[in-house]
Amino acid sequence: RRQRQMCIRDRSRSENQSNRYSWMMSIMRRLNEKGTTLALNILNSDSWGDNESFSLSKTTYFRLEDKLGNDSVLFRNQYLKSPQKNNSWRVGITFAQPIGKKMHFRVAYNWDTNYERDNRDTYELSSLTKSEVFGELPPDYEAGYVDSLSNRSHSRTNGHNLDVGLNYSDDTWMFNASLGMTPQKRAIERKMGKLYADTTMHTIDFQPMIWVNWKKKEARITFNYSGRTRQPSLSDLMPLTDNSNPLYITRGNPDLKQMFSHSVRVSFQHSKKGISANIGGQMEQNSVTQVVLYDAKTGGRETSPINISGNWNVYGSANWWKRLGHFSLRLDMNGNHSNRVSMINEDKSLEPKKSTTRDTGLGCDAVSYTHLRGPRD
């Protein structure tokens, strides 16, 4: 017979208040008759808020014993206050220069800064109020402040984005290519209970893009590729453990790597023959996923982020359209296939296993309809 690990009885109530504003300004000036332009852009946003919550819980652990040999019981009557504040600025200039009649050169620079503050203050009310009282703060609630269950998090990111692009256009070809590079300095200070950690990172992200279009009479072929690197969140990189909830413990991973996503698409269209088709796909390298470990005694979970590769998908579609007098026929076909990789721990072991989920979809739709003419005058 399967033995129960725990029994939880809880009540909770929360209130959240948030505020946000943003503004932007853009100024562009034409420098000469050839079309050389210079633009200035400024963007600012600010948000702040406060979350207050009450939590009353009683957890009985059937596989843990107290000093008297009985089932261990954890009783909590908590008040949590979580103020947050975010502020960001972006200031950039863009310079565009025609090169002849068919080509344009573009360079843009942006300076970005972002500040985030996320705190949590925890107060234990068990010894300050009656057990049946819920959702009310006693006058001396600050005496129940629990440092080990509270945290402080302050982070700032400063980045410089440089983007260089080239455009070309004539009667047959259209071409657009760009490369973006973003060096960043990211710093975070975090305190969880009595644990403290801070770190400063210097990273570089890249954003390549190419778009090519060929057109001749009624036929058109388009190719598009875009890529992007992305850094793990600073909170995931911190080597700290948050055990404020004993049944849901989270850990950081300072060894997380940079993620890289790719997207490609090719399309064909012939308007006179009424046919079109496209095929494409996406792929991710070093995606971040959560690994879950289970505690057999308490039934609790412990999660931490890791990198994993193997997430990709492909898709395609084709369309045919034909008009026959007052009738029209249309045939649509499409298909897709995805491959998703994750870490699972169904047997609640200490070694999670890699799991791959594959999905395939096919569709076909045929439509016929009649064109009706209105009465003549």
Named regions from a protein language model:
Residues 17-57, 75-376:
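Exposed, low-structure sequence patches enriched in small/polar residues
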